[in-house]
Amino acid sequence: EAIVAACNRGEIDAQVVLLICDKPQAEVVRRAERLGVECFAFSAKDYATKEEYERQIVHLLDSNGVELICLAGYMRIVGSVLLEAYGGRIINIHPSLLPAFAGARAVEKAVEYGVKVFGITIHWVDDTLDGGKIIAQRAFEYDGNDPEEVHRIGQQIEHKMYVETIKKILK
């Protein structure tokens, strides 16, 4: 939503043309539809292979003239079909200061470990798990043990940070 709003305000010289979501019932699908963004919501189990649904995604990206893919909450490892077609044009936002706490449940793992400095990382997507070249990072301190509070603070930072980073990439 923050990216669409920034595009609509002219803050980012781009247009969000497509939302791809691997959870058809996710609230983001309804939000995107309200904002007039085309949606492709799929369930991986409806496809025989990862390559099959990634080919469908590539077709949709190509037919919509997509130049940059911005992942958010996409909890799947990007596969070879998508990387071959769009490598170097896919970014991801992750709720930790990578390379620490890569993968799923990053915030929960960090809280369990006793971390006091949390953060957000935006990175290029490659064939590793959250291992692509880092584009931007922002840290924040939190001295509690509530993962939900860390997520809440992090999401406030993410919205502004992703917009700023996309602007820089597109310049």
Please identify what each model-predicted range represents.
Residues 33-41:
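Short, conserved SAM-binding/catalytic segment
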Residues 40-45, 93:
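Short beta->alpha connector loops at strand-helix junctions that form conserved
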Residues 41, 48-66:
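Glycine/small-residue-rich loop that forms an oxyanion/phosphate-binding "nest" at active or ligand-binding sites
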